[in-house]
Every structure is written in C-alpha cells, then in structure tokens.
A protein has these predicted regions:
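Conserved RNA-binding domains used in RNP assembly and mRNA/RNA metabolism
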Residues: 1-94
Length: 94
C-alpha cells in the first residue's frame, strides 16, 4: 500500500492509499480522516462515506495543500483496517 497523508485546503488531514498522481489530479482509495479523541489519541472516520466501497476517488490538486508520508504507527493501523489479511504485531515473544 502507498499510504499518504493529504492535507486539504479545508484543513482536513486525510489518510489514503495513493494510486496515481498527475500534475492536475490525485487518484486515491480508502480515504480516512483523522479525528482527535477525548483520550488524546487519534481515531479514524470515513472521509467520503457515501462513495461506493473499493471505488477510487479523483481529487483535483487545487484542493491539496500538501502530501506526506504517514507515521509508521498510522500506516500500521490503516493497513489493519483495510488489509484482508490479519497481520500479527511486531512485538517479540519472550
């Protein structure tokens, strides 16, 4: 997965799988928006809840402030949500 954080000009930070990018557009899938919780952590919610599942979305670059790599723990959580395969945690067993 090519997991990225996209900052929209509306202020939202959207975690996505980036499929393709051109000078004018980005093609993404599985967009989630990060939302702070009362416990100080970040939760995820759907960014485009009315879009058909597993369908890509095209976004104009004119709405994008920046694109960046997501933090490792964010990528791991994102992949757990969208991966059809359950992956074990990377902790050592003693």
């Amino acid at each position: 997965m090519n997991v990225k954080v996209i900052r929209m000009n509306t202020g939202e930070e959207v975690i996505v799988t980036l499929l393709n990018e051109t000078e004018e557009n980005l093609e993404i899938e599985n967009p989630l928006v990060g939302m702070p919780t009362q416990s100080g952590q970040i939760g995820f919610g759907p960014w485009a809840p009315l879009v058909k599942n597993d369908e890509s979305i095209t976004i104009s670059r004119s709405y994008v402030v920046y694109i960046a790599d997501a933090q490792v723990d964010v990528v791991e959580q994102y992949e757990k949500i969208f991966s059809p395969i359950e992956t074990p945690s990377k902790k050592l067993i003693l």
